[in-house]
Every structure is written in C-alpha cells, then in structure tokens.
Amino acid sequence: MEKMSHDPIAADIGTQVSDNALHGVTAGSTALTSVTGLVPAGADEVSAQAATAFTSEGIQLLASNASAQDQLHRAGEAVQDVARTYSQIDDGAAGVFAE
C-alpha cells in the first residue's frame, strides 16, 4: 500500500494562484478603458469601422480573459480547500495518537 502524503506548501500555492487571478482581473479592468476609449485615426469611414471592430474584438477578448481568471481563482481556492482538509485530518489523526 502506498503511503499518502501532502505538502503543506500546497495551500500557499493555491493562495498564489488565486492572487494571480485577481491581478489578472484588475489588469483586464484597466485594459477595458484603453480598449473602449480608442478614437478613430481619422474622420473617414474606414477609420471609424476599424475603431469599432477593435473595440468589439477587445471587449470579447477581455470577457474571455475575465472568465479564465475566474476559473483560475476557483482552482486556487480548491487547492487551498484540499490543503486545509488534509491539514485538519492530519491534525486530528495526530491528536488520536498523542492520547
């Protein structure tokens, strides 16, 4: 039978993943201002269409990024939960053996 173990550093890794995801959301929010505030290069119709297309594509990309960051945040929280559960079980088992 193979011994199961877990490294307590997993909780720190989960926290870092969650923090990185939150930074990604913040960066996306900052980028939204630049993407939606693009002014057409000229007064012609092509420039207006290009600016509109850029804005539309940028908004879609940022929405995709926000979704990905949300999934990363959830994954980080899941790793933290698993690490917490392992620690609680290990502490409980250690208490039984200490008695």
Curated annotation (Swiss-Prot):
One of its GO terms (cellular component) is cell surface. Keywords: Secreted, Virulence. It holds the Pfam family PE. Disruption phenotype: Inactivation impairs expression of EsxA (ESAT-6) and EsxB (CFP-10). It comes from the Bacteria. Coiled coil: none annotated. It is found in: Secreted; Cell surface. Residues 1-90 form the PE domain. Plays a major role in RD1-associated pathogenesis, and may contribute to the establishment and maintenance of M.tuberculosis infection. Together with PPE68, stimulates the secretion of IL-10 and MCP-1 from human macrophages, via the interaction with human Toll-like receptor 2 (TLR2). Belongs to the mycobacterial PE family. Interacts with PPE68. PE35/PPE68 complex interacts with human TLR2. Could be used for serodiagnosis of both pulmonary and extra-pulmonary tuberculosis. This is PE family immunomodulator PE35. It comes from Mycobacterium tuberculosis (strain ATCC 25618 / H37Rv). The gene is PE35.
